[in-house]
């Protein structure tokens, strides 16, 4: 009787868990097309913004596009 219980447990519980593809197993679809069209400068800005870092410019090139100005 115990052997039959083990066999039922394996086939009814463990086997379906091993064969199911969970969401974590699926490849993530991120907007790959859109990200390939982004220039390296824009990509850097996105990453810096996500990391919470500021983009600083050298003093002669401060035109308002950067967050801070530093002297060289």
Swiss-Prot record:
Position of the signal peptide: 1-24
Cited InterPro entries: Conotoxin (IPR004214)
GO molecular-function terms, A-Z: ion channel inhibitor activity; toxin activity
Entry superkingdom: Eukaryota
Free-text tissue specificity from the UniProt record: Expressed by the venom duct.
Cell compartment(s), UniProt: Secreted
UniProt keyword annotation of Signal present: yes
Propiece residues: 25-54
Disulfide topology: 56-68, 57-66, 62-69
Keyword list, A-Z: Disulfide bond, Neurotoxin, Secreted, Signal, Toxin
GO cellular component terms, semicolon-separated: extracellular region
Record has Cytoplasm as a keyword: no
This protein's domain notes: The cysteine framework is III (CC-C-C-CC). Classified in the M-1 branch, since 1 residue stands between the fourth and the fifth cysteine residues.
Family note: Belongs to the conotoxin M superfamily.
Protein name: Conotoxin TsMLKM-012
Phylogenetic placement of the source organism: Eukaryota, Metazoa, Spiralia, Lophotrochozoa, Mollusca
